[in-house]
Amino acid sequence: MSSESTVIKVTGKSAADNYDVVVGRGLLGRLPELLGERVKRVLVIHPRALRLTGDTVRDELASAGFTALTAEIPDAEEGKHIQVAAFCWQVLGQNDFTRSDAVVAVGGGAVTDLAGFVAATWLRGVKVIHMPTSLLGMVDASVGGKTGINTAEGKNLVGAFHPPAAVLADLDTLSTLPKNELISGMAEVIKCGFIADPAILDLVEKDPSAVTDPQSAFLRELIERAIAVKADVVSEDLKETGRREILNYGHTLGHAIELVERYSWRHGAAVSVGMMFAAELARSVGRLSDADADRHRTILETLGLPITYRRDRWQGLLDGMRRDKKSRGDLLRFVVLDGIARPGILDVPDTSLLFAAYQEIAS
């Protein structure tokens, strides 16, 4: 197994949008250098479940000469609320954080979303470095500069684009994850295979059991490929004005499921069902072949990801999809495939088409 780190670069229209995603093991020691000499104060935001990890990061920074503090927030989606952001702002204010200081996010995707939002809004923007500890956080939430919190009306409806200064994806942290969380995170990896990199699908089909082994070089390759897909798309379209929409494959229905379930479903599980729905929708209008639609079902099922959802929840899902950020007026828009690695947009003026596709995944 390689001990070398892999650096995947994200570039933008300005130097401020450029940053590195470092994938490797034992990366904590790189954090002080990435923060830089101008930073004096650092707030480490972490969930309750990672208190010891957060304290370790704080102590590492303190030993390097920083004034380091921690802010403990609720686990998972419970942490993505305005009240939690306000608590973090209070800590920053009470400790005299300036524009030259920084925030470090330690945790899964919900933590990087919240910490990024806090950094984006404090003094109109301070440096943030993400240290994702989940598979989902590594391949999705920490890369791309999207930040956000949830409201009663939907997921991530309040947020900002705020690229991190760096991302440290330390693979050692994956060893602490339950198997079902690794499997859930694989949904975002598989998504990258469907929309851009078919080699991801080939690798998963070759050895699906290896995706639950956090020590395997196989899983590392999948992670690096998925990050490379996202880095490529984000480098071209930071603020989702065009191509970046393809990263929302499976997310229109997926976010609606999360809303209906009051965020009790894992994000990856919801996206898995959403991708299956998008495949059936594309098949129904003749844009995706039977073979490619069936490949969705086979790969997702093989990994143990869900591909069906409750038949009696359709109206709630439709209401949730109407709030999707891709919608334009009363027109619902979906990312669909015209083939593997050939994403496109489907505008749906008639919800009966959606209902018919939903019947193919309803249980």
UniProtKB/Swiss-Prot annotation:
Keyword check for Zinc: yes
Function: Catalyzes the conversion of 3-deoxy-D-arabino-heptulosonate 7-phosphate (DAHP) to dehydroquinate (DHQ).
Catalyzed chemical reaction(s): 7-phospho-2-dehydro-3-deoxy-D-arabino-heptonate = 3-dehydroquinate + phosphate
Record has Amino-acid biosynthesis as a keyword: yes
Protein family according to the UniProt entry: Belongs to the sugar phosphate cyclases superfamily. Dehydroquinate synthase family.
Primary gene name: aroB
Any one cellular-component term (Gene Ontology): cytoplasm
E.C. numbers: 4.2.3.4
Binding site for NAD(+): 75-80, 109-113, 133-134, 146, 155, 173-176
Cofactor comment text: Binds 1 divalent metal cation per subunit. Can use either Co(2+) or Zn(2+).
Cofactor dependency: Co(2+); Zn(2+); NAD(+)
Domain of life where this protein originates: Bacteria
NCBIfam families: aroB (TIGR01357)
Taxonomic lineage from the root: Bacteria, Bacillati, Actinomycetota, Actinomycetes, Micrococcales
Protein name: 3-dehydroquinate synthase
Top-level EC class: lyase
Pathway in which this enzyme or protein is active: Metabolic intermediate biosynthesis; chorismate biosynthesis; chorismate from D-erythrose 4-phosphate and phosphoenolpyruvate: step 2/7
Entry's localization field: Cytoplasm
